[in-house]
């Protein structure tokens, strides 16, 4: 069979862009996008994306050029996930909650040629552009009015080249979109959140995004024509690749500019939402919403981004949400590990089910392999649920590498074929992975490795605590000790004291894991996707000095 080799008919490049054309054929008259009073069908979305792609190409945007977008979860943001790569360009969705200085650095680093800007981010982008180096080329700006309002190109300032509507109106609906020459061609550029360090440019190819999109649908068991609520920002790892996934299954995208628990519950009731995604902070918001009542119909919710406390999972599911839990990174374009549920677990007590579901799980069906290894030797750690190691993985959705950072790429993607995530975890005897911390968040107290996540889980079980995060505080004797930052629920008649919270932890944790310090905050600092920015809290803890300077050295 040596003569049987790949041929053009069997090696068409894998790309998720074809999902849109199929959606227009199969689900043409079905609703694709809803945003306030605005709605489109899949035929209309397909036509709009072709017009937009043709206009982008007519501006001199070539294969490999970066096109950026600064916008929330509005219809234009959804359309650009197709239109930009359909023009042969690389989509760069920018976190709109970043400050102007950081945005300026990212845009300059990416050499972005064109930037689509939501009308509420006008001042932000102009400030960012003003911070460009003097000799640096400035990208052209496209103004995006809110489609639910009467905004048009007359609102444009001289800084903007044209409006989004202009590009749609003058585009060619018969445009032949640019098929990648190779499935390995770059399609997406995302920057990491910067929760632990400076953001890095992560490049994904058409093949990787295709694999992640299909994998996400299979693993979550997404049916045809779901109603999907956009609570997860599309600028965060491209919404875990669900923009393309919703086209593949002909779903309805319910777009939201912003949300809170009241808006979410209203959207669920109004549109019959079946699916949504969000970080554990969204689950915490929903489960603590004033006057929340159990849902009349089940809503599937996928959570990831941080290890969810089992207490939060328990409260959320008691309201009628069916929670699925996964794990992924910007570098994997979405979730590559999920807590695959076993039927026999249904018969366990609710608290035990929540504990099992809080584990990250096993590799998804299209993820080649995951493991937990000793970061020094590279050997797999014991599958005992307690031996810590670094989480490593390999698979088709892992990034091509970091933009303009060969050293960083080589450090994380080693010669032995593994991608080193920087996350610390354990492997349980049943083969399920559990994330314990980021490597920078592990607390080493008296020579013991201490998981901040385990302490946080206990804090979240306290009836008065809304949010909790634990970091290391310097200690002259122990090296480091746990320092807890908490925010309390609203409307408490009696607020717990630091001593009471410490006593609560002492009743449920080994002595060395009990926080020596509890700091009360109105709200914890978070990224736009709900991840607590622990580097800010670590700086605060360091500023407190030693926890036991001149004090008792005994373990609590």
From Swiss-Prot:
<comment type="similarity">
    <text>Belongs to the ATP-dependent AMP-binding enzyme family.</text>
</comment>
<dbReference type="InterPro" id="IPR042099">
    <property type="entry name" value="ANL_N_sf"/>
</dbReference>
<feature type="binding site">
    <location>
        <position position="531"/>
    </location>
    <ligand>
        <name>ATP</name>
    </ligand>
</feature>
<dbReference type="InterPro" id="IPR020845">
    <property type="entry name" value="AMP-binding_CS"/>
</dbReference>
<dbReference type="InterPro" id="IPR000873">
    <property type="entry name" value="AMP-dep_synth/lig_dom"/>
</dbReference>
<keyword id="KW-0067">ATP-binding</keyword>
<feature type="region of interest" description="SBD2">
    <location>
        <begin position="326"/>
        <end position="402"/>
    </location>
</feature>
<comment type="pathway">
    <text>Secondary metabolite biosynthesis.</text>
</comment>
<keyword id="KW-0547">Nucleotide-binding</keyword>
<dbReference type="GO" id="GO:0005829">
    <property type="term" value="C:cytosol"/>
</dbReference>
<feature type="region of interest" description="SBD1">
    <location>
        <begin position="260"/>
        <end position="325"/>
    </location>
</feature>
<dbReference type="Pfam" id="PF13193">
    <property type="entry name" value="AMP-binding_C"/>
</dbReference>
<feature type="binding site">
    <location>
        <begin position="192"/>
        <end position="200"/>
    </location>
    <ligand>
        <name>ATP</name>
    </ligand>
</feature>
<dbReference type="GO" id="GO:0050218">
    <property type="term" value="F:propionate-CoA ligase activity"/>
</dbReference>
<feature type="binding site">
    <location>
        <position position="423"/>
    </location>
    <ligand>
        <name>ATP</name>
    </ligand>
</feature>
<feature type="binding site">
    <location>
        <begin position="435"/>
        <end position="438"/>
    </location>
    <ligand>
        <name>ATP</name>
    </ligand>
</feature>
<dbReference type="GO" id="GO:0016405">
    <property type="term" value="F:CoA-ligase activity"/>
</dbReference>
<dbReference type="InterPro" id="IPR025110">
    <property type="entry name" value="AMP-bd_C"/>
</dbReference>
<dbReference type="Pfam" id="PF00501">
    <property type="entry name" value="AMP-binding"/>
</dbReference>
<dbReference type="GO" id="GO:0043759">
    <property type="term" value="F:2-methylbutanoate-CoA ligase activity"/>
</dbReference>
<dbReference type="InterPro" id="IPR045851">
    <property type="entry name" value="AMP-bd_C_sf"/>
</dbReference>
<keyword id="KW-0436">Ligase</keyword>
<comment type="function">
    <text>Involved in the biosynthesis of prenylated phenolics natural products which contribute to the bitter taste of beer and display broad biological activities. Catalyzes the ligation of CoA on 2-methylpropanoate (isobutyric acid) and 2-methylbutanoate to produce 2-methylpropanoyl-CoA and 2-methylbutanoyl-CoA, respectively. Can also use propanoate and butanoate as substrates with a lower efficiency.</text>
</comment>
<keyword id="KW-0963">Cytoplasm</keyword>
<dbReference type="GO" id="GO:0031956">
    <property type="term" value="F:medium-chain fatty acid-CoA ligase activity"/>
</dbReference>
<dbReference type="GO" id="GO:0005524">
    <property type="term" value="F:ATP binding"/>
</dbReference>
<feature type="binding site">
    <location>
        <begin position="325"/>
        <end position="330"/>
    </location>
    <ligand>
        <name>ATP</name>
    </ligand>
</feature>
<protein>
    <recommendedName>
        <fullName>2-methylpropanoate--CoA ligase CCL4</fullName>
        <ecNumber>6.2.1.-</ecNumber>
        <ecNumber>6.2.1.17</ecNumber>
    </recommendedName>
</protein>
């Amino acid at each position: 069979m040596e003569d049987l080799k790949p041929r053009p008919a069997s090696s068409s490049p894998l790309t998720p862009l074809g999902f849109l054309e199929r959606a227009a054929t199969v689900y043409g008259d079905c609703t694709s996008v809803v945003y306030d009073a605005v709605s489109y069908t899949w035929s209309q979305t397909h036509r709009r994306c072709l017009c937009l792609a043709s206009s982008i190409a007519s501006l001199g945007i070539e294969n490999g050029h970066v096109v950026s977008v600064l916008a929330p979860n509005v219809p234009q943001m959804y359309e650009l996930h197709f239109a930009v790569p359909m023009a042969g360009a690389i989509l760069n969705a920018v976190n709109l909650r970043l400050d102007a200085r950081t945005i300026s650095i990212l845009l300059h680093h990416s050499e972005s040629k064109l930037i689509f800007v939501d009308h509420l981010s006008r001042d932000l982008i102009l400030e960012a552009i003003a911070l460009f180096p003097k000799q640096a080329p400035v990208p052209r700006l496209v103004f995006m009015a809110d489609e639910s309002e009467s905004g048009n190109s007359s609102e444009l300032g001289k800084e903007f080249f044209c409006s989004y509507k202009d590009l749609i109106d003058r585009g060619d609906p018969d445009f032949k979109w640019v098929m990648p020459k190779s499935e390995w061609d770059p399609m997406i550029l995302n920057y990491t959140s910067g929760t632990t360090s400076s953001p890095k440019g992560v490049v994904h190819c058409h093949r990787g995004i295709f694999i992640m999109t299909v994998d996400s649908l299979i693993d979550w068991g997404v049916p045809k024509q779901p109603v999907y609520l956009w609570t997860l920002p599309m600028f965060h790892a491209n919404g875990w690749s669900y923009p393309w996934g919703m086209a593949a299954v002909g779903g309805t995208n319910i777009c939201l500019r912003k949300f809170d628990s009241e808006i979410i519950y209203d959207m669920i009731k109004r549109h019959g939402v079946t699916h949504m995604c969000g970080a554990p902070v969204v689950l915490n918001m929903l489960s603590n919403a004033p006057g929340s009542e159990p849902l009349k119909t089940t809503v599937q919710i996928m959570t990831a981004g941080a290890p969810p406390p089992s207490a939060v999972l328990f409260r959320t599911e008691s309201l009628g949400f069916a929670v699925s839990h996964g794990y992924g990174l910007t570098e994997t374009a979405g979730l590559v590990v999920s807590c695959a549920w076993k039927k026999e677990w249904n018969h366990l007590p609710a608290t035990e089910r929540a504990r099992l579901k809080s584990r990250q799980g096993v590799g998804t069906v299209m993820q080649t392999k995951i493991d937990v290894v000793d970061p020094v030797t590279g050997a797999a750690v014991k599958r005992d649920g307690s031996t810590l190691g670094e989480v490593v993985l390999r698979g088709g959705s892992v990034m091509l590498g970091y933009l303009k950072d060969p050293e960083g790429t080589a450090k994380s993607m080693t010669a032995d074929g593994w991608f080193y995530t920087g996350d610390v975890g354990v492997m349980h005897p049943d083969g399920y992975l559990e994330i314990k911390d980021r490597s920078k968040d592990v607390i080493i107290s008296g020579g013991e490795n201490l998981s901040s996540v385990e302490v946080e889980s206990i804090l979240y079980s306290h009836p008065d605590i809304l949010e909790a995060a634990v970091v290391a505080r310097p200690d002259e004797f122990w090296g480091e000790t746990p320092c807890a930052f908490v925010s309390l629920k609203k409307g408490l008649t009696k607020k717990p004291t630091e001593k009471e919270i410490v006593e609560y932890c002492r009743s449920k944790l080994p002595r060395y894991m009990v926080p020596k310090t509890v700091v009360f905050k109105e709200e914890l600092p978070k990224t736009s996707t709900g991840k607590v920015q622990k580097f800010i809290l670590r700086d605060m803890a360091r500023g407190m000095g030693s926890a036991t300077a001149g004090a008792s050295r005994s373990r609590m």
